[in-house]
Amino acid sequence: MLESAPFARLPTPMNVEQARFNMVEQQIRTWEVLDQDVLDLLYVVRREEFVPAEYRAFAFSDLEIPLYDGADEGERMMQPKVEARILQELAVKKNEHVLEVGTGSGYLAALLAARSHHVYSVEINPKLKAFGEENLRRGGVENATVQLGDAAQGWRTFAPYDVIVLTGSTPILPQTLISQLKVGGRLFAVVGDPPVMEARLITSVDEGSCYTTDLFETCLAPLKNALQPARFEF
């Protein structure tokens, strides 16, 4: 469990940059993130500015960070290495439109926005929607739209999308989400139940057809209202 105050103060500016360098070189690069464009972006988008004030001393740590003090929903920022792998595996292009399911702090949305034409981020928690939106505004991110709603099984408003990212896990992947991908589109999701979950990349080949690549094992808190498997009664 993280302690916040009195250990929340960031180091001096020089040490902040050293901590960022260590995060990239020791955590992220060693986790098979070798795309130099992704690594460079992690120096540009300042992670510490998206972390709640009481946890900023942990901004570059290899752990999940609570998104606001006293959170009763369990929302957390992903580990930096997971965020970086997501960026690398999705290989987002500048002309692409992205759906992010779960805004959280807004940090991943900012990273995605730097590589895409526009990010549509949907957050079910009003407090986190406001938190993430304000972080994006302060960060000068103009090509990300944050909306309040439930996108765990899709978001038709701006569909279809080139890229879809789920920032929480889902026991099974809804077909409605896959159907909102453009041909050639990619979807990142962590699928399964604890303690065994698999990060997967789903690529749309043509209408109604896709293939799945298993990327790595991890464990994320589930999305609210994530699709559950059918339960049979005897």
List PLM regions with ranges.
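Class I SAM-dependent transferase core
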Residues: 2-99, 107-110, 115, 128-142, ...
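Conserved nucleotide-cofactor-binding alpha/beta core module
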Residues: 87, 91-211
